[in-house]
Amino acid sequence: MAGPRETIPPGNSGEETIGEAFEWLDRTVEAINREAVNHLPRELIFQVWQRSWRYWHDEQGMSISYTKYRYLCLMQKAMFIHSKRGCTCLGGGHGPGGWRSGPPPPPPPGLV
């Protein structure tokens, strides 16, 4: 028989927590994208999104949630550096950015 320390407390099976974490990740990725578009060129945001998927998901075989997490870390760092260097955007944003030739990549979540 399992001791009291070995049982899972009621309401903490882990399933709810995992589901909530995935929802938080999706909401946070969308939120940072909506804010980043006011500070960073759209093409930069799109390229980071595409390259994150290509590298972490396609090449390394990591899960979708891990790929989103790595993308989120990169975007948080980009936003931090942008702010640290003295953001003067004042919500004006950078517009669509200078697209390369050819069609633009599909947008990341929150920028559809």
Swiss-Prot record:
Disulfide bond annotation, renumbered to this chain: none
Assigned keywords, A-Z: AIDS, Host nucleus, Host-virus interaction, Inhibition of host innate immune response by virus, Viral immunoevasion, Virion
Pfam families: VPR
Biased amino acid composition, Pro residues: 102-112
Location relative to the cell: Virion; Host nucleus
Highest taxon, organism lineage: Viruses
Matches recorded under InterPro entries: Lentiviral_Vpx_assoc_factor, RetroV_VpR/X
UniProt region (Disordered), positions on chain: 92-112
Alphabetical list of Gene3D superfamilies matching this protein: 1.20.5.4730
Subunit and partners: Interacts with the P6 region of unprocessed GAG. Interacts with host VPRBP/DCAF1, leading to change substrate specificity of the CUL4A-DDB1 E3 ligase complex. Interacts with host NUP153.
Entry function: Plays a role in nuclear translocation of the viral pre-integration complex (PIC), thus is required for the virus to infect non-dividing cells. Targets specific host proteins for degradation by the 26S proteasome. Acts by associating with the cellular CUL4A-DDB1 E3 ligase complex through direct interaction with host VPRPB/DCAF-1. This change in the E3 ligase substrate specificity results in the degradation of host SAMHD1. In turn, SAMHD1 depletion allows viral replication in host myeloid cells by preventing SAMHD1-mediated hydrolysis of intracellular dNTPs necessary for reverse transcription.
Protein's UniProt name: Protein Vpx
Organism: Human immunodeficiency virus type 2 subtype A (isolate ST) (HIV-2)
Taxonomic path: Viruses, Riboviria, Pararnavirae, Artverviricota, Revtraviricetes
